[in-house]
Amino acid sequence: MTDHRTRFLQLALDADALRFGEFTLKSGRLSPYFFNAGRFDSGAKTAQLAQCYADAIDAAGLDFDLLFGPAYKGIPLATALACAYAGRGRDLPLAFNRKEAKDHGEGGTLIGAPLAGRKVLIVDDVITAGTAIREALAIIRAAGGMPSGIVVALDRQEIASDQDRRSAAQAVAAEAGIPVIAVANLGDLLAFAAGNADLVGFQEPLLAYRGRYGTDTTG
């Protein structure tokens, strides 16, 4: 497992953003783990998280020249990532959307750098149903931008349903025709748990969950 994946998972565990136990998801599934990016709730935690994102993006070789953060969690993530890249000598333009359009001031739903003609990388925490990402794709295209990729913190790599064996990330990637990458995925989480004495007890529930809900590419 590459270093940024291990660093991210340890950071998430330390921040209590990654928890193990029994959690009922919005889908109704009973999951042995839960990820909440909202627990990266300080400058230091967010800065470290952004470095993990940047390492994952660079490792994937994504081609982009603007960062876009969908409201709401994508906004601080994209902002922190822009700061991380500035520290690496790359000053990237940044934009995000608001949920409700304004009819005063600058107006509209978009804030930040113009999207027209830009290769836009969408930055978010997870892809659950894909609704927010699809909205972001539509907003970017309507503004003349060209979506070039999507990056999230954690890919759960689980099927949408028994009828659709793809994950939400796989479905979005196929629909949009762009790469979707994650800092870490369920396969990485399994490897991380196996190498952590405090988490070995969760290995069996994780494997059972992957067996029931994992995509064919989970590994």
Curated annotation (Swiss-Prot):
GO terms for biological process: 'de novo' pyrimidine nucleobase biosynthetic process; 'de novo' UMP biosynthetic process; pyrimidine ribonucleoside biosynthetic process. Its cofactor is Mg(2+). It comes from the Bacteria. One of its GO terms (molecular function) is magnesium ion binding. Pathway: Pyrimidine metabolism; UMP biosynthesis via de novo pathway; UMP from orotate: step 1/2. It is an enzyme of class 2 (transferase). PANTHER family: OROTATE PHOSPHORIBOSYLTRANSFERASE 1-RELATED (PTHR46683:SF1). Catalyzes the transfer of a ribosyl phosphate group from 5-phosphoribose 1-diphosphate to orotate, leading to the formation of orotidine monophosphate (OMP). This is Orotate phosphoribosyltransferase. It comes from Xanthomonas euvesicatoria pv. vesicatoria (strain 85-10).
